[in-house]
């Protein structure tokens, strides 16, 4: 038996920046998904899990299945398909999988699950030689095309790389990444996972639409193609064309992409207080872009749980 692990992910700065070619800064949590796996000498992948169910996938049966939408078997099939499409030949394996990520924590379980399956195949059959970027790309394809939930690649990359990671999406086809060396345990703080009820999914998708609409009205494919000064100069016209909410969200894109870099720089310099200041600033701006009724619901939860303080003494 061989042990494998993929951490959950959270974003410190640069929310929604990926889709517009900006910067993202996040980290892989110590809580994630763990597996014990071994080759079984067959053409069957056998998954056994109390958290994700037990099922078998036949190697070579790579077509997406409608009935598997939003299931973990779809993710395994998707990862398997990516390896095979890349010309990689491998055998079946048995894996016992368990999750350490609390339900309702706001941290995706699909992302570390995808990366975990990729790590198992890479580790058992290819001497752990598959690069993190390739594993992340496989995860993105599995989630978008097999699981049925379109997504970016930020979280997959962070989970695959581990630790604190600054991502640069100026070239979306080949994102750049930099590992930031900082030990949070030595800061006197810890990152706490709390139940945030996951109440904002639909509202977050609207943010992406707003950002894309502003970029289109500026004649660009993404906001990163525009200079911030150009955006400010066109602000009055864009406000008329796109609406107030969209243009202020676009303004936050420029600020948030910059914050991601500043947060990473603060930790590189060992300035945790400056990192916290920027992180808090980022959180406050997000509240301004949540609809009133959702903001009230969020405020009620944070009052009960102190959710606004992710970092606690």
Which residues fall in each region the model found?
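C-terminal nucleotide
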Residues: 1-13, 34-74, 82-85, 89, ...
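Gly/Ser-rich oxyanion-binding loop with an adjacent helix/lid
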Residues: 1-22, 69, 73-184, 197, ...
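A short catalytic or substrate-binding loop motif that flags glycine-/basic-rich loops and adjacent residues
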Residues: 17-19, 27-29, 257
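Structural signature of FAD isoalloxazine-binding scaffolds in flavoprotein oxidoreductases
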Residues: 22-41, 161
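Short, amphipathic alpha-helical segments that act as regulatory/interfacial helices
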Residues: 29, 80, 118, 212-215
